[in-house]
Amino acid sequence: MGKSEGRAQTLDLDLRLNLSTRKNYETTNMKLQYFELDKPYVENQQRVEELMDSAALTYEEARIKDYRQNWKDLRRAFVYESKCMTSMVERLFKPVVTKDCWKIIVECVDTISNPSIMNLLGVYTVQVLFDFSSYKTLSPLEQKKLLLEALLKGLKRVFKELSIPCSLIEDVVNEIEKNDYENSWEWKRKKIQSTIFSIQVEHQLDKVDLFWKIEQKDKSIRQLIQSYPAHEMDYGAKLCKLEAKGNFLYLLDKENEVVSKLELETIAE
């Protein structure tokens, strides 16, 4: 690639690697139910050329090294932050049967390098403009609004391409606005005698908090279980089942290990 080529080039190594494992790709009866905001790699041509010269790398090798050294962590941080809104959209959105789409990725970019809507193994990707400099200066609430705005803009483009009514996603956005952009929900509850025990999830930009909520006739108590990174991959496996055994109520993970426990006699006092 010559130096005269001025537009930003994008790289999505993780996505390609992940999707290459989907050997049984089908083009019919897919359910669209997953959404993601991404910060795709923007090539720094000077850095790439310096890597080529200093480490005797090919152009592609230098780009991959530059991505891993200078971009991968930034991208991961943005994806994790944006999960606060994208996971809320996924939770409220009713899956739609499509011909060939199960996920939509909206790439947030300073400059549109690819105006087309791309489809790779059922994952549709579209780019939207995003002001990262402004985003960093905003309050958490305003950051959530900007993230949701970018997601909505990209989803509407793909929905129109797939002839999906945009009202389906607009209704979800309205619900999020009514909830003041707070991504909180009850995962599971269990009633023991007259007391209701539940697990509450609070998904913020920088973390996910899991709580016990204990509701009795005359009082309600919340206890923090633990905080996790803001991605389903980090906290999702902790939520498997609530099990009462003896004098304890256990939160068990998917390996049947104890995440947290409550002593029922103590609660009853």
Whereabouts are the PLM-identified features?
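Acidic, small-residue rich beta-repeat scaffolds with periodic aromatic anchors
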Residues: 13, 25-153, 232-269
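A residue-identity detector for tryptophan
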Residues: 1, 13, 71, 102, ...
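Extended rod-forming repeat segments used as scaffolds/tethers
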Residues: 10, 19-21, 88, 177, ...
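Long amphipathic alpha-helical scaffold segments
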Residues: 136-189
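C-terminal, beta-strand-rich globular interaction domains
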Residues: 188-269
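N-terminal amphipathic/basic-hydrophobic helices that include classical n-h-c signal peptides
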Residues: 1-26
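Short, flexible coil/linker elements and helix-boundary hinge sites characteristic
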Residues: 12, 18, 56, 160-163, ...
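Intrinsically disordered regions, especially transient/low-confidence alpha-helical propensity segments
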Residues: 68, 99, 182-184, 209
